[in-house]
């Protein structure tokens, strides 16, 4: 069974949900970059202090800093891991592959959670978050298309990509993912 996994998909496609479900049934480490950054800040580590300072200025955390945090968590692996929310662009994907090669934990499969845009927008609006207006959601989807969608071809070229129809119920999606891990 594959044990070094990545979930890719638009905001609201269900990456975090599916990664967490899989983590619970496999004991694989679920590495969400957002949660990793928050954890570093909460623990007041040197990296966390840098991240907090950057975020307080309203800036994006650099690729290098995110990669450092991801790397230190991957090194802890002894069972398996699931990456969610990283990489977000081709540069990050190249850097991640270099790190995974260095620590001898190559990526084994990338699950692309594919979902129609209108279903995605409806799903995000139903979440009821204050910042989830139709306008902000469409902006996030547009940014995703420009920066993250090229990763689909990147991982397809590496023969790592598995398409998952994310416009179904949680159990069916989860079952599909587990079958493709075998």
Curated annotation (Swiss-Prot):
It is an enzyme of class 2 (transferase). One of its GO terms (biological process) is AMP salvage. Its EC number is 2.7.4.3. CDD domains: ADK. One of its GO terms (cellular component) is cytoplasm. Its main location: cytoplasm. Pathway: Purine metabolism; AMP biosynthesis via salvage pathway; AMP from ADP: step 1/1. AMP binds at residues 33, 38, 59-61, 85-88, 92, 129, 140. It comes from the Bacteria. Disulfide bonds: none annotated. Gene3D superfamilies: P-loop containing nucleotide triphosphate hydrolases. It catalyses: AMP + ATP = 2 ADP. ATP binds at residues 12-17, 127, 168. NCBIfam families: PRK00279.1-3, PRK14527.1, PRK14531.1. Catalyzes the reversible transfer of the terminal phosphate group between ATP and AMP. Plays an important role in cellular energy homeostasis and in adenine nucleotide metabolism. Monomer. This is Adenylate kinase. The gene is adk.
